[in-house]
Amino acid sequence: MSARIVVSADGRKAFESWRQAFAAVAPDVDVCSWYDPAWQPQPGDYALIWKPRSEHMERLAQMKGIVCTGAGVDHLLAHTDFPRNIPLVRMGGGQTARLMADYVIWAVLGLLRGARTWAASQEQGVWYNNVCSRTSDTTRVGVMGLGHLGAYVAQALSRMGFCVSGWKRSPAELDGVTVWHGMDNLPSFLAEVDILVNLLPSTPATDGLIDYGLLSHLPKGAGFVNVGRGRHVVQDDLLRALDDGTLSGAVLDVVTPEPLPQDSALWHNPRLTITPHVASEASREAQARYAVDVVAMLERGETPALLCDVARGY
């Protein structure tokens, strides 16, 4: 492949690790550091980025294509001078999807079996037998957002034996999953969900969507898993729902802000499990392989599956 991949992801100090990752999976690919003083943009350059600084935008506009190491690109499109005419591809690949599915399955099973109670009992040295008779095949899991990751997660849950439904903006069909679409159908979707999983993209339309009113459409005592974005959720409303029994428990991998301040009330709710945005971060080797494959597709004039629709924001 004659194209060159210029790496800015994770900063200057991370480049050697990235170089080794590319060497392991695609030793013939030309890779250089964004921070190399000798680097000057060439017509065949592609950028691998995460959170570029404002001063990077001028050079990004000279790229032939851009690959983001995150599944979300809202932080990029928030830059008013981000080059919207350059192909922008979100992170994907088998490892990214599998990691997300594994995390969600862990979270859903934990909510199903009341694992938070076991952890609290262990901390207190108390032998508390909270027997659970619910099983996966009688538990209804609903996934909000059926994009690349959401669809994969929904089907993974279905294969585990859960009764799975999904909700998205537009009509779709998905094997093993009952699909609802449109805002008019959202309350009906929620009414048949025991554990709600959020994997929506971050857009102005979805930010703050998950509030007390939305959660109130769920059956009393439902569970909630957020692996989308922290700002999808009105966090005070989430705490209210946990405190009054609207929700029996929740697992959050994303919050706002990140890192979560030490004095946040979220840390101290006994029905809430928080993880530090670790649900799905593929190895550098897997991300490098994905970037090489994306660049090869763009060089052939093909359209990658996760090419960003800038107008939609994902």
Residue map of PLM features:
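N-terminal glycine-/charge-rich "phosphate-binding" loop or analogous flexible N-terminal tail
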Residues: M1-D45
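Short acidic low-complexity segments
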Residues: V31-P43, S54-M57, V177-V193
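Phosphate/diphosphate ligand-binding glycine-rich loop within oxidoreductases
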Residues: D45-A119
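Short, well-ordered coil/turn residues at beta-beta hairpins
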Residues: W50, T69, L199-S202, V227, ...
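C-terminal helix-to-coil terminal segments
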Residues: P87-Y103, T117, E258-Y314
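Glycine-rich NAD(P)-binding loop of Rossmann-like domains
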Residues: W118-Y152, V179
